Amino acid sequence: MSLDVYLYERVTCPKCECRIDTNHRLYSANITHNLNRMAEAAGIYMHLWRPEEIGIDTAEQLIEPLAEGIRKLLANPKQMRTYNASNGWGMYEHFVPFVQEYLAACTEHPTARVEACR
């Protein structure tokens, strides 16, 4: 089982200036569910796995929480590694780059629509 995260392009209608969602995928990534406890410890479980449940629908809304989560991950590597999956599928060394890359994509595409599939 895994988590898939997506960013989709949103465009502005030139006539009425309303936002229109598109199916144009700007970013996607996948990570194992085995990292959910590490995400919780870093304070970003809901932001990654269930953004719609906390009112997040644009990438801009993820920038600060993900940045804070990365700070926590990097400040406490020893503690965070205690959440490594014993089977090797879900390690700190995989999770940190996943969150960093997702943050970079959110920063690059702040108006993008966020979607998470579990």
Q: What do the PLM-derived regions correspond to, one by one?
A:
Residues 1-118:
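Acidic (Asp/Glu-rich) sequence patches and key acidic residues
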